[in-house]
Amino acid sequence: FKGNYTGDGTEKTGVYFRHLLPETAGGSHPSFLIANTETLIPGTSTFFGSTAPPNAADHKVVFAGFDDELAPTLGGIYLAPLAPTPALTTLVSIGQRVPGDRTKAGFNALGEGIAFDGRFVGFWGAWGEESREIKLYCPAEGNRDRIAYCNKELLCEGADEPIGDPGSICDETGCFQLRDVPVNQGIFVHDTRTQRTHVLAKTGDEFDDFLFWNYAGKAPCTGTGPLG
């Protein structure tokens, strides 16, 4: 699992595991660290700036971690045994050549949601500088503070006037934000035995996108999550 916490006044995040027993609350086994923001990105002298929720199978775990979650220049997808502070094996990395791409481009974005069955790792990846603009309409369901902030209707305690996300645009259709998303993206599978990465599908004539983009802005004066 992924855990967020604050240490010495600094926000931190990490990937952990815990052995569960058929008892109340899963037993009393402690949780163990796999990697966190005090772990060096393999092959670099840079610490992880973010880690994503892991996926575990066959006593192994895979997860994505980057130096910068929003604009990664280092990091990738990693494999590790379910053991305390294990050695990490790099499966796919930022900058690695995209399989099957004639331009020899490298990945500049990798998805946090990863499928894993103990051998094969499925993931989303993007590359290139080309982008297209989409509208992200403010959510109608979910956290009420986040909804209010997106719609410029959030009233903080002690304030006289409501505030809103400066990135929101409101018209007769409602409030929304404009987001640039990558044109070049695809779904890939990495074989941990052969160490080869294969393409399943790419954007082009048949597909425009492989992700559902949504607004997840952090609302100030509340305890909601980070911008995503």
Name what the model sees in each region.
Residues 1-228:
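Conserved "turn/edge" positions that cap or connect secondary-structure elements
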